[in-house]
């Protein structure tokens, strides 16, 4: 297996190639006593290995670039003064320099090469090859991507996309290359390659390939989504949960009554909903065995913890956020008991759930959306950004992230909206906006109440519930749901003085309006303004 020729990538004098290592090999490699610094993994009391990623404990969006060439120029959603995003242009000359730095770093070394699939649908899956010098990074992609069988590996052939992880190399001349810092994550759609320099954070590999799937799939009529998904045990219908980091995608889709398709990245084609990944990447800050048993129990041998505080004897402190609030674990999806087998895909979705963690305490715990509101709130992608998933953010601040994943969109947001709406119209799916954040009590809505709301959406009882309209937003909200505290369903009731809600609601409504202005450059966008908040 290890007779791979890496010289075609410019990587020379390779000492040894460890090709698609087993979990036992990875464990031995990442815990070698001779390892130092961020390469060294620590075995914890739960059997999982913990690693530290240095100053980058989250993605570094300011350091993300696409090479501007004939493959990308007219199709990528480039950042602009009117609408800033993370897709910054990089020159061919800068790319050549960065690629040279990466292959130089990887040359003359003992390397890990992990050949994976991205996408559970064989017809449209991407063959992705990862090349790195650090064992735990090989472990990370082995967890997160779809692991080929021995037969699939034997017939793998050439990859569709190659990611070079040179975390140890720095971009000293970044200013002359037109970059942001000594760190870079750069994509070349022409050569179908990704280069990672000077960041150890595992999520750059995962989300990097997600950006590529988000480029390819909508162009071939497949909805590409930053969401989790599950299905009923009979496999009759799926539900998808959109939401930014920390809004509850992983927690709420991991449901003992249902089968998990996946927790973060999916496609929806004419056959149904399918996972892009072969693993889960869950936040573990304040992880509690009682409230999230599935995730807790997934943390065992072969799982990989990131930036968690672990004592010398292996004892884990999940409450300690001194390194970062964005502590994580990656594990192969089969560490969760209730999953769709053998392939992570399900039927068409009947329920589409938008999760927002509203720090303002304005949004109802659940709203039933019209088709027009569905498009408006999908393009708005509102949440309050929760602490620490990106560098430099620690307080809850309002965030509008198109399609609940603007950081990963490689095409214009309206393209993702179009594809989602097409699929929803085809299957008659309904959308719901669920607030997993705060209300007038100053406390976060309990996970018990949120789970009750999700149950009512999934079993259809929400569609039978009595409802009323909420002002400014014109949301239709149920006034009673089984197993949910009725006093929270109208957010005004959670305030000592409803005038307080009124004031905050007007403020938030104005923020929605201001944000949506950037979508009104065409007729379709203009037509949706009426579905948004009105003052």
From Swiss-Prot:
GO CC annotation terms, alphabetical: cytosol
Binding site for Mn(2+): 207, 226, 264
Required cofactor(s): Mn(2+)
Any coiled-coil regions, as ranges: none
InterPro entries: PEP_carboxykinase_ATP (IPR001272), PEP_carboxykinase_C (IPR013035), PEP_carboxykinase_N (IPR008210), PEPCK_ATP_CS (IPR015994)
Top-rank taxon: Bacteria
A family per Pfam: PEPCK_ATP
Gene Ontology MF terms in the entry: ATP binding; metal ion binding; phosphoenolpyruvate carboxykinase (ATP) activity
SUPFAM superfamilies xrefs: PEP carboxykinase N-terminal domain, PEP carboxykinase-like
Gene Ontology terms: biological process: gluconeogenesis
Record note on cofactor: Binds 1 Mn(2+) ion per subunit.
Recorded metabolic or biological pathway in which this protein acts: Carbohydrate biosynthesis; gluconeogenesis
Family affiliation: Belongs to the phosphoenolpyruvate carboxykinase (ATP) family.
Its job: Involved in the gluconeogenesis. Catalyzes the conversion of oxaloacetate (OAA) to phosphoenolpyruvate (PEP) through direct phosphoryl transfer between the nucleoside triphosphate and OAA.
HAMAP family cross-referenced by the UniProt entry: PEPCK_ATP
Name under which the protein is recorded: Phosphoenolpyruvate carboxykinase (ATP)
Organism encoding this protein: Parabacteroides distasonis (strain ATCC 8503 / DSM 20701 / CIP 104284 / JCM 5825 / NCTC 11152)
């Amino acid at each position: 297996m290890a007779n791979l020729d890496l010289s075609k990538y410019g990587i020379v004098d390779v000492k040894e190639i460890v090709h698609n290592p087993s979990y036992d090999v990875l464990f031995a490699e990442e815990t070698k006593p001779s390892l130092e610094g961020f390469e060294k993994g620590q075995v914890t009391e739960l059997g999982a290995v913990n690693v530290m990623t240095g100053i980058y404990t989250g993605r570094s969006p300011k350091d993300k670039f696409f090479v501007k060439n004939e493959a990308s120029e007219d199709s990528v959603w480039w950042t602009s003064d009117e609408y800033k995003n993370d897709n910054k242009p990089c020159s061919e000359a800068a790319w050549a320099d960065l690629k040279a730095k990466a292959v130089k770093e990887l040359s003359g070394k003992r390397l890990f090469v992990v050949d994976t699939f991205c996408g559970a649908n064989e017809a449209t899956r991407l063959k992705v090859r990862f090349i790195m010098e650090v064992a735990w990074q090989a472990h990370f992609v082995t967890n997160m991507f779809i692991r080929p069988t021995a037969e699939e590996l034997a017939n793998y052939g050439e990859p569709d996309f190659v990611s070079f992880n040179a975390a140890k190399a720095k971009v000293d001349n970044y200013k002359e290359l037109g970059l942001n810092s000594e760190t870079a994550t750069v994509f070349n759609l022409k050569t179908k390659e990704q280069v990672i320099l000077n960041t150890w954070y595992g999520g750059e590999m995962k989300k990097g390939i997600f950006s590529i799937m988000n480029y390819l799939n909508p162009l071939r009529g497949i909805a590409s989504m930053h969401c989790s998904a599950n299905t009923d045990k009979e496999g009759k219908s799926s539900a998808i949960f959109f939401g930014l980091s920390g809004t509850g995608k992983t927690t709420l889709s991991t449901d003992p009554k249902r089968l998990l398709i996946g927790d973060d990245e999916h496609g929806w084609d004419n056959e149904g909903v399918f996972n892009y990944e072969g693993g889960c990447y869950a936040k573990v800050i304040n992880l509690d065995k009682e409230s999230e048993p599935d995730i807790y129990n997934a943390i065992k041998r072969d799982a990989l913890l990131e930036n968690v505080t672990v004592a010398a004897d292996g004892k884990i402190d999940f409450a300690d956020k001194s390194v970062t609030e964005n502590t994580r674990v990656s594990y192969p999806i089969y560490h969760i008991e209730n999953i769709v087998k053998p392939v992570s895909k399900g039927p068409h979705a009947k329920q589409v759930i938008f999760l927002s963690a509203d720090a303002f305490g304005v949004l109802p715990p659940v709203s039933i959306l019209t088709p027009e509101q569905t498009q408006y709130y999908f393009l708005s992608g509102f949440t309050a950004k929760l602490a620490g998933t990106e560098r430099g953010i620690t307080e809850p601040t309002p965030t509008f992230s198109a399609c609940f994943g603007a950081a990963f969109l490689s095409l214009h947001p309206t393209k993702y909206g179009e594809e989602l709406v097409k699929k929803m119209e085809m299957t008659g799916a309904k959308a719901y906006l669920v607030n997993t954040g705060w209300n007038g009590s100053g406390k976060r809505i309990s996970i018990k109440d949120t789970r009750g709301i999700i149950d009512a959406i999934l079993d259809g009882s929400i569609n039978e519930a009595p409802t009323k309209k909420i002002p400014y937003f014109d949301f239709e909200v149920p006034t009673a749901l089984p197993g949910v505290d009725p006093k929270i369903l109208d957010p005004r009731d959670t305030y000592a003085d409803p005038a307080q809600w009124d004031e905050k609601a007007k403020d938030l409504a104005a923020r929605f309006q201001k944000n949506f202005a950037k979508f009104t450059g065409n007729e379709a966008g203009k037509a949706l303004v009426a579905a948004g908040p009105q003052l």
